[in-house]
Amino acid sequence: MENIIRIINTVLSNRGKKEVTVINKNSHLRNDIGFDSLDLAELTVRIEAEYGVDIFEDGIVNTVNEILQKIDSK
């Protein structure tokens, strides 16, 4: 989970947005973290590079927990 938080904050920082300090498994990528479509695209690229998983391969991912499940099912 710490790596996912790091990646999320890297994406936010790269886009000039404020990093989040509180993220849990139920955090919604758009509503809670503030991601837009460009942030989600960068997140996808970074997670695929680090974990070899396309988190959007089977549809939309909305929460941190859904990302973790995709990585765990690899």
Label each residue range with its predicted role.
Residues 42:
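Conserved alpha-helix in the HATPase_c
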